[in-house]
Amino acid sequence: MPPKPRIALIAHDHKKDDIVAFAARHRAFLSQCELLATGTTGGRLIDEVGLDVTRMLSGPWGGDLQIGAQLAEGRVSAVVFLRDPMTPQPHEPDINALVRACDVHNVPCATNVASAELLLAGLARENGAAQAG
């Protein structure tokens, strides 16, 4: 049996409600995975969805970079990063570095809910789990 997927969950402020709703819909599958998240997102997933999440720093304080470092070490299976394309982010270079690391290391990265749905369905199929959702 393959190892548990280790999934990073990240969301910009205007997308936090979306990632909480997404995680709630997929709670059964996500609870079978190892999860890590940036600080505020992780706190909401713990408090509102009841998931076990390893929290990094908040994104603007280096959380995206912490996740990127683990990804570069081969310790992240997939990234769900719900980005807000309409709001400038003060830590945009960190965000670009994380997405680039996904590309360099061939780690799937979903940046909107539609692609995140497909990503989880693929992980569930690959890991023989019940369909995500």
UniProtKB/Swiss-Prot annotation:
Keyword Transcription: no
Start and end residues of each MGS-like domain: 1-133
Protein name per UniProt: Methylglyoxal synthase
Record-annotated active site: 64
The organism of origin for this protein: Cupriavidus taiwanensis (strain DSM 17343 / BCRC 17206 / CCUG 44338 / CIP 107171 / LMG 19424 / R1) (Ralstonia taiwanensis (strain LMG 19424))
Gene that encodes it: mgsA
GO cellular component, one term: cytosol
The keyword Magnesium belongs to this UniProt entry's keyword annotation: no
The EC number(s) this enzyme carries: 4.2.3.3
Record's catalysed reaction(s): dihydroxyacetone phosphate = methylglyoxal + phosphate
